[in-house]
Amino acid sequence: MRGQQERTGPLFSYISTEERIPASHPLRQVRRLADQALDRLNPTFCKLYPEGGRPSIPPEQQLLALLLQAIYGIRSERMLIEQLDYNLLFRWFVGLNPDDPVWHPTTFTKNRDRLLNEELMAKFLELLLSAPEVKPLLSSEHFSVDGTLLRAWASHSSLERIDGLDDDPPPPSGGRGFGGSSSGTKRAKGDFRGLLLSNQTHRSTSDDEARLFKKAPGVGAFLSFMGHCVMENRNGLVVASEVSQATGKAERDAALRMARSLRGAHQKTLGADKGYDTREFVADLRINGITPHVAQNIQTRRSSAIDGRTARHQGYAQSINARKRIEQVFGWIKQSAGLRQLKARGRSKVGAVFRLHVVAYNLIRITNLLRAQEVMA
């Protein structure tokens, strides 16, 4: 017999959201790991809020919602709240009952200064990695480092001269800069035809900490920041991260800072690509008791800072091979999580957002590793 469609929905539901989520759903493990770390952050959250006044949206719920945004690659906080309103899975993950109202998207804006700071996100990552079931997954000896460009939330049209003067008039029509106005007229805002832009002469008015940087010769320069990660080589988990201004030495300087912060008394190795093959960087690593497993840059006229005493060992080849896995971290963060184009301004805010996405990546990676262990057990 043909069934009839019910046009009027029921007024009540007697099935909880907990029962609707499959027991094998990966978000269950993600939420459990995130809740453990957030519970240990409770003393820090208490210091961020005054004792009196109206109750706020719990900071744990806001951070869980932002983790969802990264995991599912939701483009904006407004779309996140829209999906949080009708998606029972998202409501369950954040801790909202089916009848609870969702908060306004501007809640994230008003709490950004409070919750999205680098120290808090770094502590979140540290507490996640210190969980009892996560510690056995980490290597304390072998690591890899790399950096990636993050497109700043600022366009070329926001560039202005640092000295406050006007740029020279544009070239005449038909010459260099074909199609422009006649010579002698004032240059329109954002018109840089015939000019050589540099970080020494121009600065963005939208984000004065962003810097012009190009990935390779022949590629256009964009206002960017640079994200850095240190990955342990056993299972590809990120153990340290930060964001810096995009400069020629930023990758090596950040790598050295993060390498010094690695804990443990064991002798450590640090794998890196050819861009880190400089005598100064290699010497600094050795001074800090870290064996540099940097890919040899032998295609240039200068000699490599890594000689045969390091390159001859089998461990060096293993580190060079394992180092490539860090590209998967950046690929997920920029492509799947949507951080190729930043939606925050200022190095500190960008650093907090980047670290939050690193936490999201680690949560997914740890969940997959623990599930594989359960299958093999």
Predicted regions and their residues:
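Basic, amphipathic alpha-helical segments enriched in Lys/Arg and hydrophobic/aromatic residues
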Residues: 279, 288, 316-377
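Polybasic low-complexity intrinsically disordered regions
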Residues: 82-85, 95-288, 361, 367
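Phosphate-backbone recognition surface of nucleic-acid-processing proteins
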Residues: 91-109, 292-294, 300-315
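Acidic, metal-coordinating catalytic cores used for nucleic-acid/nucleotide bond scission
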Residues: 53-57, 271-279, 298-300
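Secondary-structure capping and boundary motifs in well-ordered enzyme cores
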Residues: 22, 26, 53-61, 72, ...
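Short alpha-helix plus adjacent loop in nuclease-associated cores
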Residues: 112-116, 315-320
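Charged, often Cys/His-bearing segments associated with DNA-binding zinc-finger transcription factors
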Residues: 1-36, 177, 186, 190, ...
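Basic, low-complexity intrinsically disordered segments
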Residues: 2-11, 15, 27-137, 152
